[in-house]
């Protein structure tokens, strides 16, 4: 998913959670997996994080050694995997989400495999059921977040919907990420397209532009530099009280605060959310397909699924997986998020981004 919050991933290290030792994507010795039948190579985006104890449990139980090749953000990693599919860098790829899934499938990136535990995945996350080329692993919502202190001080009700964001009361308050360079920025664009349809989303963005929306390159700049509520407002540099981020951002604000507040300093505009789902799959031409299948099985176990929320700030997809109380209290998934079929995204994404760029950035 990335959820591509490197800030959250970095802070996780301080909690005793570790990013797995990563190989350089440019190291020629790692260009085509290890070929070692007892080593599994997992290719992923930069934000993949797992508890060391969970990984060790898998290695002890399975007899395999896991190494991780981190290959940039989700889009970069998927593109690299497609380019190297005939001689893949690893055995399993994790981190292709629903915004990029059709591109990966159309390019033959994965081979079929039904992971053990697939029947325990919540129905709304299941996809590619006829060919089983990918396994759902986690989900998350991209949503507008708001700085509670700002709206309290200004006696202004926080926006809750896409329509609210174009009202005069919220002029010059929103910062979002570039849809062509950022996963949350793209998600927000897709959410607006899902909400207003093919003929309505451009008109919406014209109104949003007229209402002073600010566009920056990526999430870190938007959240940590432009948003007034970052780190509970204590370290915020920006003056924008609205930012495109994640439904899991308010829980992170509580979990990483010292001392911990009794309430989250930020909230979520639940009517602006777009649902992301991340998948993993067995790479075509994987050197260690048997080991890759074992790793995919493990990623659907309760142990791995329970471990994800505090590592990557995403929600598990397995039934009865545990979610930290901070998530339930401060950042539950949206009840009715915007969604788009992967096929629709594949057909329209590039043109939407091109039109958005021309409309908003020029």
Spans of features found by a protein language model:
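A structural signal for short loop-to-beta-strand junctions that line the ligand-binding cleft
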Residues: 88-93, 111-146, 163, 173-179
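Short beta-strand->loop
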Residues: 111-119, 133-135, 163, 241, ...
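Periplasmic solute-binding protein
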Residues: 98-109, 127-157, 185-195, 275-281
């Amino acid at each position: 998913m990335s959820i591509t919050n490197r800030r959250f991933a970095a802070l996780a290290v301080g909690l005793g959670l570790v990013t797995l030792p990563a190989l350089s994507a440019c190291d020629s010795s790692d260009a085509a997996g290890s070929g070692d039948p007892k080593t599994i190579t997992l290719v992923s985006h930069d934000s993949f994080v797992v508890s060391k104890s969970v990984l060790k449990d898998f290695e002890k139980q399975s007899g395999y050694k896991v190494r991780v090749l981190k290959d940039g953000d989700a889009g970069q990693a998927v593109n690299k995997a497609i380019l190297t599919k005939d001689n893949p860098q690893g055995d399993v790829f994790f981190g292709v989400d629903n915004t990029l899934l059709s591109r990966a499938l159309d390019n033959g990136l994965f081979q079929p495999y039904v992971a053990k535990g697939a029947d325990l995945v919540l129905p709304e996350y299941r996809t590619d059921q006829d060919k089983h080329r990918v396994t759902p692993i986690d989900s998350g919502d991209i949503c507008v977040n708001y700085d509670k202190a700002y709206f309290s001080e200004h006696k202004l009700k926080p926006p809750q919907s896409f329509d609210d964001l174009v009202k005069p009361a919220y002029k010059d308050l929103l910062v979002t990420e570039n849809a062509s360079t950022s996963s949350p920025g793209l998600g927000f664009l897709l959410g607006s397209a899902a909400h207003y349809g093919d003929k309505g989303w451009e008109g919406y963005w014209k109104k949003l532009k007229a209402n002073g929306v600010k566009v920056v390159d990526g999430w870190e700049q938007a959240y940590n530099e432009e948003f007034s509520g970052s780190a509970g407002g204590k370290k915020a540099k920006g003056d924008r009280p609205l930012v495109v981020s994640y439904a899991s951002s308010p829980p992170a604000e509580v979990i990483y605060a010292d001392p911990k507040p009794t309430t989250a300093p930020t909230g979520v505009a639940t009517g602006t959310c777009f649902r992301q789902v991340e998948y993993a799959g067995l790479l075509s031409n994987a050197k260690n397909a048997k080991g890759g299948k074992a790793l995919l099985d493990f990623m659907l176990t309760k142990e791995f699924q329970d471990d994800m929320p505090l590592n990557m700030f995403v929600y598990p997809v397995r039934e009865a997986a545990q979610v930290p109380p901070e998530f339930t209290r401060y950042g539950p998934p949206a009840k009715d998020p915007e969604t788009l079929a992967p096929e629709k995204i594949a057909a329209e994404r590039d043109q939407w981004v091109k039109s958005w760029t021309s409309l908003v950035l020029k």
